[in-house]
Amino acid sequence: MAAQVTTSTDKVLRQPILGSRRFSNMLWASVSAIGGIGFLLAGLSSYFHKNLLGVSDPSNIQFIPQGAALTFYGVAGTLLSAYLWFVFFLDVGGGYNEFNKETGKVTIFRNGFVGKNRIINFQYPLKDILSIRAEIKEGLNPRRVLYLRVKNRGDIPLNRVGEPIPLAELENQGAELARFLTIPLEGL
């Protein structure tokens, strides 16, 4: 888990948000690429009766049904790996939260998938911010999220999606943000 570096001055507070550029995503993309290419080469070796894989000799395997299954799993693993690398390089979900007292605006910026809505950028006036709300649910699927309560809008999540952040870090982030914006902190 990478440490979150919050940039703060008297007038601007900027919190970077970690998206899909995580070590775990890179690890899974690499593992699925190695496995997918290995299965694909093993399946093609059984079809062409020629060894394309340097580690073993799968050319003696019958293509129907074992070689076809190996080829199918190889294509599936390679496509999964390509998708994971694509999401990794786009940094889907990454961005920042910026609270600027100079301009009087809150900016919530996130990267999305390629397309019409590639960049997600919400801006709200500081006067419309009502409070910071912390939601903490423990159990099998724990959830620890900070929300920005905006007038005439729904609650906007402020932290990353995925693994829940430690409770102490959530409390510190919420308190720092509430102190900076001089608004109440709810839910703790």
Curated annotation (Swiss-Prot):
Compartments it resides in: Cellular thylakoid membrane
Alphabetically ordered keywords of this record: Membrane, Photosynthesis, Thylakoid, Transmembrane, Transmembrane helix
Lipid bilayer topology: Multi-pass membrane protein
Transmembrane segments: 26-48, 68-90
Top-rank lineage group of the source organism: Bacteria
InterPro entries for the chain: PSI_Ycf4_assembly (IPR003359)
The keyword Cell division appears for this protein: no
CC per GO annotation: photosystem I; plasma membrane-derived thylakoid membrane
Any Pfam family matching the protein: Ycf4
One annotated GO biological process: photosynthesis
Family: Belongs to the Ycf4 family.
Function as written in the Swiss-Prot or TrEMBL entry: Seems to be required for the assembly of the photosystem I complex.
Name listed for the protein in its UniProt record: Photosystem I assembly protein Ycf4
